[in-house]
Amino acid sequence: MDSNTVSSFQVDCFLWHVRKRFADQELGDAPFLDRLRRDQKSLRGRGSTLGLDMETATRAGKQIVERILEEESDEALKMTIASVPASRYLTDMTLEEMSRDWFMLMPKQKVAGSLCIRMDQAIMDKNIILKANFSVIFDRLETLILLRAFTEEGAIVGEISPLPSLPGHTDEDVKNAIGVLIGGLEWNDNTVRLSETLQRFAWRSSNEDGRPPLPSKQKRKMARTIESEV
């Protein structure tokens, strides 16, 4: 196993522990708590994949961080902060909407890269809006935290979430995953549109109703599927 992979996991575990202590003192805001919960799932998945214990890794990560801080000067810290581009965290959903449990009558699940797409195929003839919480850098989606599909009544009927064991995705990965979710929901005559923030940052262009144009490859794939079932 690569030593950098192990040490990276150890440092991530310790930094998560520090953030958890901060949250335990009721000092974290909603975006902070969102990321904390998601990162915990990611760390558990990575620990399982690597065969490493999180508690042991946290102690090792503490030693690594302490060693770095001992060598770090205030001037070097200022230069590091100045050189890192700042990202923004955007929220379509409340904490309640993000953490709410939901159930599917006819579940369908698909994995696309490091993203998991889930939808309820029993939903028909509904107006659906896609909402997401994500970070943005250079006016583009950087990291998806969670995307969910809501009916006008507020019911959750679909979801796109990062897989804890496979961290890392691009804005193009998210775009393709949304296309899959939209295609699945529209198959049952649902009308799907995107929130304004998704329209702006996940796509640079969309139809007037907020519905993004499907990538040409996806259109061809859907057309072949329809033809094969007729």
UniProtKB/Swiss-Prot annotation:
Single Gene Ontology BP annotation: symbiont-mediated suppression of host cytoplasmic pattern recognition receptor signaling pathway via inhibition of RIG-I activity
Span of the annotated motif Nuclear localization signal: 34-38
Post-translational modification comment from the UniProt entry: Upon interferon induction, ISGylated via host HERC5; this results in the impairment of NS1 interaction with RNA targets due to its inability to form homodimers and to interact with host EIF2AK2/PKR.
Location of the region described as PABPN1-binding in the Swiss-Prot/TrEMBL record: 223-230
Alphabetical UniProt keywords: Eukaryotic host gene expression shutoff by virus, Host cytoplasm, Host gene expression shutoff by virus, Host mRNA suppression by virus, Host nucleus, Host-virus interaction, Inhibition of host innate immune response by virus, Inhibition of host interferon signaling pathway by virus, Inhibition of host PKR by virus, Inhibition of host pre-mRNA processing by virus, Inhibition of host RIG-I by virus, Inhibition of host RLR pathway by virus, Interferon antiviral system evasion, RNA-binding, Ubl conjugation, Viral immunoevasion
Keyword RNA-binding: yes
Record carries keyword Lipid metabolism: no
Pfam family of the protein (one): Flu_NS1
Region (RNA-binding and homodimerization): 1-73
Residue numbers covered by motif Nuclear export signal: 137-146
S-S bridge residues: none
Single Gene Ontology MF annotation: protein serine/threonine kinase inhibitor activity
Compartments in which it is found: Host nucleus; Host cytoplasm
Function statement: Inhibits post-transcriptional processing of cellular pre-mRNA, by binding and inhibiting two cellular proteins that are required for the 3'-end processing of cellular pre-mRNAs: the 30 kDa cleavage and polyadenylation specificity factor/CPSF4 and the poly(A)-binding protein 2/PABPN1. In turn, unprocessed 3' end pre-mRNAs accumulate in the host nucleus and are no longer exported to the cytoplasm. Cellular protein synthesis is thereby shut off very early after virus infection.
The record's note on its domains: The dsRNA-binding region is required for suppression of RNA silencing.
Name under which the protein is recorded: Non-structural protein 1
Organism, scientific name: Influenza A virus (strain A/Pintail/Alberta/268/1978 H6N2)
